[in-house]
Amino acid sequence: MAKATGRYNLISPKKDLEKGVVLSDLCNFLVSQTIQGWKVYWAGIEFDVTHKGMALLHRLKTNDFAPAWSMTRNLFPHLFQNPNSTIESPLWALRVILAAGIQDQLIDQSLIEPLAGALGLISDWLLTTNTNHFNMRTQRVKEQLSLKMLSLIRSNILKFINKLDALHVVNYNGLLSSIEIGTQNHTIIITRTNMGFLVELQEPDKSAMNRMKPGPAKFSLLHESTLKAFTQGSSTRMQSLILEFNSSLAI
């Protein structure tokens, strides 16, 4: 009896790319619009980014909030009560998280040049611009970055996402709820909230936290759903998150 098969189907480009990341994947932050928000492709990884939670962030910043939310404003005064702070899009939040993941690798591992230098440049590009393409001019970098190295970078980014997943929602028990990474020009703080991850970018000296004369800060919210697909044992983790839900936290 005849049966249908897919024996000679072409391998989709996406599956093919999963075997290894090429340099161009690290230097392209490809964005397409969706009904819920955006689809982002970077380093062989596809992210679904949503607008969820952003309206609430704007309300907290502009005083248009319920009295019960005042604790959240007081917990992050350098963001919600600082005239020098600005709200960015969730796409920006994802870029900062990816840049932080790269910086985490540079801190954790003794990477050889030119790999460390190249990663530093890619991290700066993600952190300080909103462009979709970074032109890596150095030929030496291109020659020495093997597929194995690039795939290692990708797997380390996924490990960093799991580090974020291991954080607890902001709590009263002293459990770890934030990751902080300092670079030469910035301080990145990523905090676990009920909705996902509150991402902030400050000056190296964290002057935004100076109550008398607050310095500049940028911040945004990346919804839980964007990173959920890349976390290990996410169903168990989701159950524990429900248990530690902080009802007094607006976001």
Swiss-Prot record:
Interacts with host importins KPNA1, KPNA5 and KPNA6. Interacts with host STAT1. Interacts with host KEAP1; this interaction activates host transcription factor NRF2 by blocking its interaction with KEAP1. Changing N171A: Complete loss of interaction with NP. Disulfide bonds: none annotated. Changing T50I: In strain: Isolate mouse-adapted. This is Membrane-associated protein VP24. Prevents the establishment of cellular antiviral state by blocking the interferon-alpha/beta (IFN-alpha/beta) and IFN-gamma signaling pathways. Blocks the IFN-induced nuclear accumulation of host phosphorylated STAT1 by interacting with the STAT1-binding region of host importins. Alternatively also interacts directly with host STAT1 and may additionally inhibit its non-phosphorylated form. Plays a role in assembly of viral nucleocapsid and virion budding. May act as a minor matrix protein that plays a role in assembly of viral nucleocapsid and virion budding. Keywords: Host cell membrane, Host membrane, Host-virus interaction, Inhibition of host innate immune response by virus, Inhibition of host interferon signaling pathway by virus, Inhibition of host STAT1 by virus, Interferon antiviral system evasion, Membrane, Viral immunoevasion, Virion. Belongs to the filoviridae membrane-associated protein VP24 family. The keyword Acyltransferase does not apply. It is a peripheral membrane protein. GO terms for molecular function: structural molecule activity. It is found in: Virion membrane; Host cell membrane; Host endomembrane system. Changing V170A: Complete loss of interaction with NP.
